[in-house]
Amino acid sequence: FMKRKSTIWFVLFLFPMFLTAENNAFGVPDSSEIRSGLIETWFEASLMTVRENIPEIYSNKAGQEFQVRLEETDSSFNVFVSPHMTMNVDVYTENGKYTKKQDVYPGDAPGSWVLIRNKKDGKPIRIRYYFLSNSEVYIQFTPYNKTSLCDLVIFGNYAVKGIPTGVPFSRFYSASLAEVQRITKSNVPWNYLEYDPTLYHSVHQMAGVIRERLPNIVYHKDAMIDENDNLVEFGSGRPIKLEEGTEKLPLSSSGFIKWVADGLVEPVAGSKLKRLPLLTQTVEYKDIGYQGVLSQEYSLSFALDFVRNISSAVLSVNTGTVYRFNESGVDVTLEPFVAGLSENGIVNPVTFSNDSGYNINVLKSLFYILANSEPGVIYFGAIRQTDNKTPEVKVFNNN
């Protein structure tokens, strides 16, 4: 019994917009002209002086409001320039409940800018720009001698880290997001963040159909529908007999993936995918070593073999050309991250390993990039698990 998920393998199968003072690719409010007038009183003044400043509201040329305020932590003091937003708040009184709109200025809203300074000596630590509805994606700058360095963080992983900008750190006191993009266009993969909501109709439609049918499916170990529409055991092909009155479709996790794939290929090919080719082994183990010895008796890569083979099969149907796994190029091998954030600070992860896959810590970041760069594509995944024993056994299991 495998207790802990360790890595995962993926195979390829096939905000609101705002009126801005300076246009940027993300359509977020621009505070650059406001910030240019705050340098002496907010950005370079001593902590004691900044504490004397009260929160202030400014408007840019487009009429958008921003709040400038100070927030402190144990080790830093932070100056926020944050755009105006409204949120619904439920108010409870003796006469019942009503909802009112409240003005807010979130520090991590799209268009928000923050300067973080050291509390001991007042020196700047970093400047951060938020430009998406999800604040776990941001770009930041740190001072370095007479210039500055750039990081792009996507859900806790660095797409770039410590890239020289060639401009002084103080430039970002007043730089707009559009200017940031111009300064970093040759070093920062902005294409990872490009999103066109009109390109996802087919994926949303497919997800809606699957979600609608989920209540009629129940988990059953090793169960699948074969090419002859029979319910069989995935590994052996033996028929599975159901109790009378069974109304729901019993499927294993692999059987569910095949059910999805069959829904894609049957309208094109006129039949479901064959079971046996999906079991072809794609991983070779050395005869020596604990894993190698076990592989001679057990399938340690069943789920990985399966998703590779079924992805190749779907590709074959869609292109009209028969591809074996090693010819299909269906493995996702993108390595877009140079480092990651953890509770212990910055780590340097190996994001991809052949026949082992991705560390699970990069999945959210990876999916974000893939969703933006390859709209309309879906992915089948295999989870590699461990028994946490010594010697350790790691398998792509069929659950």
Task: Locate the predicted segments by residue.
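Bacterial N-terminal signal peptides that target proteins for export
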Residues: 1-9
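Cysteine-nucleophile amide-bond enzymes
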Residues: 22-399
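Bacterial N-terminal signal peptides
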Residues: 9-18
